């Protein structure tokens, strides 16, 4: 019997309703993926930072050295007197906030700075640490500083760990100075990363390794370390 005849017999063996159901499920799945990709693209390309005039503490998400200067400017302008600084790659400028008396920016006088290495080494690890510290300190308004393409995903992750019942989350954005290629790379990575966000709805929920590796590969292509490749640099609170 020919292969074509075999396929025909298989098709005839499936009831019409089953074939219709499979087609409907496949169509709905495709529409769901298309909607999700469109929503993620909109969130990455059209963020809405809050720029609140004052927060109890500001979480400085690591992305590139410019974020440290932006954090110093916000603290110096009176937005906050407490910084949680994700600083695990140094020395790359974080010493302006986390260094000794001779290295620290003088504009941070009177500002409490807590530098930490997140676990895991992701935005998720950073917001977990900040949320824990907010609860320990009895604080209720958390600011989060990151670059524009990351604002809405950072908001979603932060609000999962520091819920509306516990307080408020406000986002700030800084100019990362990306060129066209850099914006494209971060945009594509941001859209892909929303897949992980949707698959891990819990605050500390992690993807299985087989699903995490594409995101790790994207990080490496952007020149960022992954997991244990990041050298932990932790400095305690300074004022």
Language-model segments: residues:
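A general structural signal for short secondary-structure boundary/capping elements
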Residues: 88, 103-108, 189-195, 215-221
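Terminal targeting segments of Actinobacterial cell-envelope proteins
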Residues: 1-15
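Aromatic-anchored segments of alpha-helical transmembrane domains
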Residues: 32-35, 174, 178, 217
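A transmembrane-helix-recognition feature enriched in membrane-embedded lipid enzymes
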Residues: 180-210
């Amino acid at each position: 019997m020919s292969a074509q005849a075999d396929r025909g017999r298989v098709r005839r063996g499936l009831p019409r309703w089953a074939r219709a159901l499979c087609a409907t499920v496949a169509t709905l799945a495709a529409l769901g993926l298309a909607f999700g990709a469109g929503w993620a693209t909109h969130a990455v390309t059209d963020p809405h930072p809050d720029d609140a005039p004052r927060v109890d503490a500001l979480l400085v998400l690591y992305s590139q050295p410019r974020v440290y200067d932006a954090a110093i400017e916000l603290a110096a302008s009176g937005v906050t007197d407490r910084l949680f600084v994700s600083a695990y790659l140094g020395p790359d400028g974080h010493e302006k906030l986390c260094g000794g008396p001779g290295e620290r920016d003088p504009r941070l006088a009177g500002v409490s700075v807590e530098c930490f290495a997140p676990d895991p080494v992701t935005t998720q690890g950073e917001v977990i640490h900040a949320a824990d510290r907010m609860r320990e300190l009895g604080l209720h308004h958390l600011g989060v500083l990151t670059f524009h393409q990351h604002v809405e995903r950072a908001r979603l992750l932060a609000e999962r760990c520091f819920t509306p019942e516990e307080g408020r989350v406000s986002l700030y954005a800084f100019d990362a100075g990306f060129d066209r290629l850099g914006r494209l790379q971060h945009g594509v990575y941001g859209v892909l990363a929303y897949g992980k966000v949707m698959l891990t709805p819990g605050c500390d929920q992690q993807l299985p390794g087989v699903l995490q590796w594409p995101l790790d590969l994207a990080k490496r292509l952007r020149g960022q370390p992954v997991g244990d490749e990041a050298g932990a640099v932790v400095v305690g609170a300074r004022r």
